[in-house]
Amino acid sequence: MKKFLMVMLSVVLALTTFVGCSNGGGGNTPAPSENTDNLSEVQKIIAEAETMTLEELAKKAIEESNGKTFYGVGNSSRGKSALPLFIEYLQSIDSSYKLDFEWQQPKNNKIFDQLTADGLKDVGTFAMTLIQDGNQIESKMVQTGVLDTFIPKEWAEANGTTPEAYEGYLPLQTLNKIFEYNCVNPDKTYDNCWDFVAEGEHGLFMDIDSEIVGKNFLYMLTKDEYAAYLKDAYDKLSAEEQAYFQPTVDAMAKDATELGLGENGKYALAWIKLWVNSYNAVTDDGPICNTLVDASAVDKFGLLVYSKVRSVEETDTVSVNNIKVAAYQPGYEGIGGYAYCHYLFVTDNSPLPWTACAFIAYMTETVDGFSAWGKDLGGYSSNPIVAKETEEKFHHSQGLSAKVACETTMDKGYDWWVGDGKLVVEDPKYCASVAFTVGSWIEMLDKYTPE
């Protein structure tokens, strides 16, 4: 084990040096002031586009794509809902504008293969993408030159920066997956994140090999900030509860040292091991939600995307009132779940780069552009102005965007979740840096198999 880890650490040191050459994980597009001799044609357009307003970009898009077909691909199907609104916006500028479109949503993490194959063409099929999983984006898409980052000027200004100064990918939104539990049995509660990995618990969760952002969540737990969350929550357990977990924590100390983790790394590895050993894999978050809200799901819990509670259909046995959000309960200790982003990129061989830039700006700079996602709770625009106006329009904090307004559906918002809610927030660069070490360690863990 030790020899294996030393080899993997050497690999990671080399890769980290390579990854660190990018502008904070921000893709291949330099600031407009830099030398553009070595830029692709799309990168040159992006550099110019980053100096323009949405209206200016819209006029470029109309000129470029009128009468053509726009192809997009994404992890979210809602790009298909956003495109007609974008077209209506362009038609408000030029009523003669027409655009056909097709939006694809590959399953089973095939989006990376699809974009890689399309990237081999001189001119690609896909104009842009909406994509998740920061680790694979960094290693497979950005460092390989398949995707380019475009930072809209007015989005940057809303965030108090400029396209030139901003470092990182462009997030459309942050989504949260949170711990929820069936509360039909009033004697069964979860008041500490270690309760979810206690003896006999089997949380419902999308398998980490089918939805990789779940694996990134486990990577992130080893980062000092989040390992400290787990240690602090552990300290709040009773002596009896600690006695159950302590042997696992102690057993992880050596591995934590060999993996180069911080002082609380053994607590992170212990939680990860117990979680992987116990979670009950489910194919999608929808079935998890449907299970938990049924009165028959006594003493069950899950880690699932928050937005699913919006659409629960009330019956005699099914109700959103049958579940509680763990982090919302008084006295709850530890992590409330995890957060990841949907990122927007222009393909480096985009057939319609101006239109792609305009569409990206529209989604990140306007409430209407974000509304395909913003109409539901649990998804937070990366533009603070759009986020504020989205809340004013849909009233997520009052539960009014769900079928039933109650404590569970009253979204406390992004700031609360990343603060008091202690969400574990995905960091693409950190995930990439530990994917070969912590990732290989996780691969060797035994998964739970229901009898």
Regions found by a protein language model. Give the residues of each.
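Bacterial lipoprotein signal-peptidase II cleavage site
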Residues: F18-A31
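Positively charged n-region of N-terminal signal peptides that target proteins for export
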Residues: M1-F4
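Mature extracytoplasmic/periplasmic domains
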Residues: H342-G419
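Conserved C-terminal helix/tail region of periplasmic/extracytoplasmic solute-binding proteins
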Residues: E41-E50, E55, C406-E451
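Extracytoplasmic "Venus flytrap"
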Residues: P32, Q43-L54, E64-P84, H342
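Hydrophobic core
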Residues: L13-T17
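Extracytoplasmic/periplasmic substrate-binding proteins
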Residues: Y267, N277-N349
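Extracytoplasmic ligand-binding site segments that recognize negatively charged/polar headgroups
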Residues: K68-E88, F101-Q114, G124-P287, E313
